[in-house]
């Protein structure tokens, strides 16, 4: 994992956790604008960019590495953080750990695990899969949805 920094001369801090398979350039315009007044930390997951090879292993390991990196840079709190999809799961984990204060957090479509017994989770999975298959195979359902 790598963390790219932009706008290091600014005091306000903002962390970006991207979604799965999100290339670095996807945040280029946003980072260019925000780095004019914020110190931006942009997370690049292992295996998500040719320059940063490796395999993404886990949300937990990523969050631990991000916290460790920020603390090594003298950052003890963040003014803001953004996480999209898998990045939302990373941000949710970071908030749950409570190891670093985050002033504002935006969780965009964060994936979170069900806190239910195994059998109930499997039944919910079966329901979801069946629902998607029925919707995908039924013109009437698709027309009603859209």
Name every feature range the model reports, one short phrase each.
Residues 96, 102-133:
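Flexible "cap/lid" loop of the alpha/beta hydrolase fold
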Residues 4-50:
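Conserved HGGG/HGGXW glycine-rich cap/lid loop of the alpha/beta-hydrolase fold
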Residues 41-82:
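Active-site loop/oxyanion-hole signature of alpha/beta-hydrolase fold enzymes
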Residues 83-91:
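Gly/Ala-rich beta-loop-alpha elbow adjacent to hydrolase catalytic centers
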Residues 27-28, 51-56, 116-118:
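Conserved catalytic-core motifs of eukaryotic protein kinase domains, centered on the activation segment
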Residues 13, 39, 80, 102-104:
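Structural signature of beta-strand start/N-cap positions in the alpha/beta core
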Residues 136-146:
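Helix-loop "lid/cap" segments that line or gate small-molecule binding pockets
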Residues 29, 93-97:
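Active-site signature of alpha/beta-hydrolase-fold catalytic machinery across serine-
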